[in-house]
C-alpha cells in the first residue's frame, strides 16, 4: 500500500505533484472568476490563470507518460512524450497569440478599490495558491535540469515541499476563515479587526 497507494497519504511523488498543480490553479481560478463576474476585475489575471491551468494538465500528462522522471506512478508509452510536448508547445503559442489579440479587452478590467473587500481577499488567496503551484512545479522539474546539466540524478524529498508549502497553506486557511465575513464593499480597519476577533474567539 505504501508503494502503490500514492504514498500512503501524500508523499510528494512527481506524479502526485503534477496532479496537484492543476488543482491549485483551478481553485485560484474559480475564486478570481467570481471577482470578475461580480465586479469586472482581474480580466487579464483570469486569462493567465485559465491558460496555465490548461497547460499544466498537458504537462502533468507528459510527466506521467514520458518517463522523464522516476515515479512509482509514471509509465512511458512509446513516443507519446514527443506528441505531448509538441501539443504543449502549440497550445502555449496559441495562448500567447490569443492573449495578444485581446489586449484591448483586458484593458477594460476595473481596478480594485476596496482594500478590505472580498476582491482583495481573492487576490491574496490567488497569490498563495499560485506561489504554491509554482514551488511545486520548480521542485518537480528541477531534477530534470539538474540531471541534464550535471549527468547525475537528484531527488527532492518531501521535506522541501513540507517546509515550503506548509506555511503558505496555513495562511490560506486563516484567509478562508476571515474572508467569509468580509463584505463586498470596503470596511473600516478597526471594524474589520473587531469582527474577525469575534470569529477567532
What are the roles of these predicted feature ranges?
Residues 1-15, 67-74:
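Interfacial helix-loop-helix junctions of multi-pass membrane proteins
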Residues 5-18, 39-46, 158, 165:
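Transmembrane helix-loop boundary segments of multi-pass membrane transporters
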Residues 14-21, 71, 75-201:
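Contiguous transmembrane helix-bundle modules in multi-pass membrane proteins
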Residues 21-34:
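Membrane-interfacial alpha-helical segments at the cytosolic side of multi-pass membrane proteins
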Residues 24, 49, 56, 63, ...:
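Hydrophobic residues within membrane-embedded alpha-helical segments of Major Facilitator Superfamily
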Residues 34-45, 185-190:
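Membrane-helix interface "capping/anchor" motifs
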Residues 40-57, 117-130:
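Interfacial and helix-entry/exit segments of alpha-helical transmembrane bundles
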Residues 52-58, 62-64, 68-69, 87-96:
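Mobile "lid/hinge" segments at catalytic clefts and subdomain interfaces of large enzymes
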Amino acid at each position: 500500500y505504501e508503494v502503490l497507494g500514492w504514498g500512503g497519504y501524500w508523499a510528494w511523488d512527481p506524479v502526485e505533484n503534477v496532479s496537484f498543480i492543476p488543482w491549485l490553479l483551478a481553485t485560484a481560478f474559480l475564486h478570481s472568476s467570481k471577482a470578475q463576474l461580480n465586479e469586472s476585475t482581474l480580466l487579464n489575471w483570469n486569462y493567465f490563470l485559465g491558460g496555465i491551468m490548461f497547460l499544466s494538465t498537458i504537462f502533468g500528462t507528459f510527466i506521467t507518460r514520458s518517463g522523464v522522471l522516476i515515479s512509482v506512478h509514471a509509465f512511458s508509452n512509446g513516443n507519446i512524450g514527443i506528441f505531448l510536448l509538441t501539443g504543449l508547445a502549440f497550445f502555449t503559442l496559441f495562448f500567447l497569440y490569443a492573449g495578444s489579440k485581446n489586449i484591448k479587452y483586458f484593458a477594460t478590467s476595473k481596478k480594485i478599490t476596496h482594500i478590505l473587500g472580498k476582491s482583495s481577499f481573492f487576490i491574496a488567496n490567488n497569490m498563495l495558491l499560485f506561489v504554491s503551484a509554482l514551488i511545486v512545479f520548480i521542485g518537480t522539474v528541477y531534477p530534470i535540469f539538474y540531471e541534464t546539466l550535471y549527468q547525475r540524478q537528484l531527488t527532492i524529498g518531501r521535506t522541501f515541499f513540507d517546509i515550503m508549502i506548509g506555511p503558505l497553506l496555513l495562511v490560506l486557511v486563516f484567509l478562508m476563515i476571515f474572508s467569509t465575513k468580509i463584505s463586498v464593499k470596503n470596511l473600516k480597519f478597526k471594524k474589520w479587526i473587531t469582527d474577525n476577533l469575534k470569529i477567532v474567539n
